[in-house]
């Protein structure tokens, strides 16, 4: 195992132990990726402009891509419909919930018209939503468990406050707003929880690289994806193995996952870290599969020895 002092000097002291693949993608870039790879989404793009693209090496691989501008179109699935315009105008409709707004740092400041289970309309609803995925510990792994929704919003009522009913509402306005808030929270949490859980359940445990040769990536989440500072973050365990060679599947005898540095997301729209553990498993698998030959010369040996 690598000396800890040297490892901390090379990798930095702020590391996460047990990680193999770690990535951060801002929300706009994530949508662009989904747009290209999801067959249900219209693939018309209004405008794409990419600047300042580079790849640098830092404890594995760090990919930097910044300044992305794009226009998008529509996504629809059964009862859920989300419409995007090139101006970043958004319209969401889920059963009785409709929302309009503009995409800013996240889906902030949405004007909502809610009619389900409530006899009157709500307008001028300013909403700020924070979505967090809770996790549960199973053995030495963290698995997705539930979604917590934090909402902060206010609104006005659309009726005549001079009427008898209007005067009654003034007296009990806070109580009515509390009931409405609870109903909206239940609806949003139910929809988001279902959608995110379905998405996480579709993540494969194995990613096939070459079926004929038996190459696969053994993959599992260390922590479930979560949103922080307008980035979708994920941390996962991964190793490259050959299903036809049992020796490559015995992870405990050769390499140990150690850690990956913390993110440096200033000026970036995405970042990916690959640990030395993943790289070592890939090299070992290629070597055992006779795809890779290792040649040590006398000069290299002397340099390493010195």
Label each region the model flagged.
Residues 1-102, 152-306:
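Extended, low-charge, aliphatic-rich alpha-helical segments
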Residues 83, 127-137:
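Extended lipid/amphipathic-ligand handling interfaces
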Residues 111-128:
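Amphipathic hydrophobic-ligand
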Residues 125, 130, 302-306:
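Eukaryote-specific, cytoplasm-facing alpha-helical/coiled-coil scaffolding segments in long proteins
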